[in-house]
């Protein structure tokens, strides 16, 4: 086990980096506190609305569909990254890599078909979809 003097000699660069980060952080916070505006008033607590008088509350309830679409996007986006990594190394991976990528794509498509079949990708309720289908006829 190295003694403390050897550790200090070995990690002096990291310690200097941390000291620089803390110093820069203190400098930026100090300058912003000195130069920043200190105006307090009733209008300070109101949200900025581009010159439009705000109406109603600032809290807006979003449908759970937005969160579902966001999660599906993240999942399929990460899977697209895996496919991109495979496409970069397709020559090195050979036939085994092609078979694995084909299985991976098949699993992706099965997941997409499953989500489609259970209605996870439908934005409108079923009653509204039936009503719109009748209107199109």
From Swiss-Prot:
GO terms for cellular component: NADH dehydrogenase complex; plasma membrane. It is found in: Cell inner membrane. The keyword Transmembrane applies. It holds the Pfam family Oxidored_q4. Keywords: Cell inner membrane, Cell membrane, Membrane, NAD, Quinone, Translocase, Transmembrane, Transmembrane helix, Transport, Ubiquinone. The keyword Ribonucleoprotein does not apply. It catalyses: a quinone + NADH + 5 H(+)(in) = a quinol + NAD(+) + 4 H(+)(out). GO terms for molecular function: NADH dehydrogenase (ubiquinone) activity; NADH:ubiquinone reductase (non-electrogenic) activity; quinone binding. Its EC number is 7.1.1.-. It is an enzyme of class 7 (translocase). InterPro entries: NAD(P)H_OxRDtase_bac/plastid (IPR023043), NADH_UbQ/plastoQ_OxRdtase_su3 (IPR000440), NDAH_ubi_oxred_su3_sf (IPR038430). It is a multi-pass membrane protein. The chain crosses the membrane at residues 14-34, 66-86, 95-115. NDH-1 shuttles electrons from NADH, via FMN and iron-sulfur (Fe-S) centers, to quinones in the respiratory chain. The immediate electron acceptor for the enzyme in this species is believed to be ubiquinone. Couples the redox reaction to proton translocation (for every two electrons transferred, four hydrogen ions are translocated across the cytoplasmic membrane), and thus conserves the redox energy in a proton gradient. NDH-1 is composed of 13 different subunits. Subunits NuoA, H, J, K, L, M, N constitute the membrane sector of the complex. Belongs to the complex I subunit 3 family. This is NADH-quinone oxidoreductase subunit A 1. It comes from Pseudomonas paraeruginosa (strain DSM 24068 / PA7) (Pseudomonas aeruginosa (strain PA7)).
């Amino acid at each position: 086990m190295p003694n403390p003097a050897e550790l200090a000699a070995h990690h002096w660069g990291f310690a200097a980096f941390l000291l620089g980060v803390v110093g820069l952080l203190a400098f930026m916070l100090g300058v912003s506190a000195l130069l920043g505006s200190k105006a307090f008033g009733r209008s300070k607590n109101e949200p900025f609305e581009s010159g439009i008088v705000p109406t109603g509350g600032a809290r807006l309830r979003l449908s759970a569909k937005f969160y579902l679409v966001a999660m599906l996007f993240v999942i399929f986006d990460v899977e697209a990254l895996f496919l991109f990594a495979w496409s970069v190394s397709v020559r090195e991976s050979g036939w085994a890599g092609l078979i694995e990528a084909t299985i991976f794509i098949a699993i992706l498509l099965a997941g997409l078909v499953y989500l489609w079949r259970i209605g996870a990708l439908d934005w409108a309720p079923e009653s509204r979809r039936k009503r719109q289908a009748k209107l199109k006829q």
